[in-house]
């Protein structure tokens, strides 16, 4: 259902409340492709340390490991949706059939990594660690993928090896969605608004619009390398995070606070000595 955003706010809010069930049903009906996250990936070396983001792998190797940031939370996207931290927890615990694909194509030849070659988990970053001016945090959906030259997709092996992959996007199904409206006349929706609004990074944009949809649970189907994305968040392209693959239920690795790229690198090096 198309939302008539040109209506005066009070009429728009009335429309949203009246059609709430249908709007949310539409959002949950089919697999959604989120706005792409423009970050690229971290190559991971044999010691489990990440290199500079998007750095080409110059060695003649048959296998590489990359860390791809697939999705982030606490940001209203082009669908008026805000992914809430924790939305992936149930899915990551229960669903072991997750793929790292090329451009959301669910085909054998498009598979980049799966099974034992893919470790999906969540990790909390500050927005400053991702090169943004905002205070606060975002919980990222992260894929650690082992990609083989002789695997299903040698083309994407070479794209990652040459540092050409700049964008990723998650393919998912929404499970739980709440509507938030900034108007006390809509009791339940106003309560949802007050619960989440202060954690939204682009808060001013959301306040100007007056409503959003809080996605509190979603099922991960796949994460894809995509050629071009519409997400306008572009994090810093330098980091030195140590790879510690999660055991059991995916948990959030420890985070550190960044002021500059040099400071974060030095802090993390000290942390992992």
Map each language-model feature to its residues.
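Signature of dsDNA virion morphogenesis modules
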Residues: 1-244
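Terminal short linear interaction segments
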Residues: 251-273
């Amino acid at each position: 259902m198309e939302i008539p955003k040109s209506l005066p706010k009070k009429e728009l809010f009335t429309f949203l409340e009246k059609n709430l069930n249908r709007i949310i049903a539409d959002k949950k009906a089919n697999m959604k492709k989120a706005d792409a996250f423009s970050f690229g990936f971290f190559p991971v070396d044999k010691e489990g340390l990440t290199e500079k983001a998007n750095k080409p792998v110059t060695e003649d190797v048959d296998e590489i490991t990359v860390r791809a940031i697939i999705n982030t939370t606490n940001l209203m996207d082009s669908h008026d949706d805000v992914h809430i931290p924790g939305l992936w927890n149930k899915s990551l615990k229960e669903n072991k059939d997750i793929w790292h694909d090329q451009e959301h194509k669910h085909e054998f030849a498009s598979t980049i990594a799966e099974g034992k070659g893919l470790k999906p988990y969540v990790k909390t970053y500050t927005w400053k660690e991702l090169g943004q001016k905002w205070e606060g945090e975002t919980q990222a959906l992260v894929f650690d993928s082992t990609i083989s030259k002789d695997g299903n997709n040698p083309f994407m092996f070479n794209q990652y090896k040459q540092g050409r992959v700049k964008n990723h996007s998650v393919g998912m199904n929404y499970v739980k969605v709440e509507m938030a409206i900034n108007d006390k006349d809509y009791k339940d929706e106003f309560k949802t608004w007050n619960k989440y609004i202060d954690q939204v990074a682009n808060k001013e944009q959301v306040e100007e619009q007056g409503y959003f949809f809080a996605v509190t649970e979603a099922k991960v189907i796949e994460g894809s390398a995509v050629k071009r994305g519409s997400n306008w968040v572009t994090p810093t392209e330098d980091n030195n995070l140590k790879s510690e693959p999660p055991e059991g239920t995916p948990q959030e690795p420890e985070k550190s606070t960044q002021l500059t790229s040099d400071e974060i690198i030095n802090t993390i090096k000290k942390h992992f000595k």
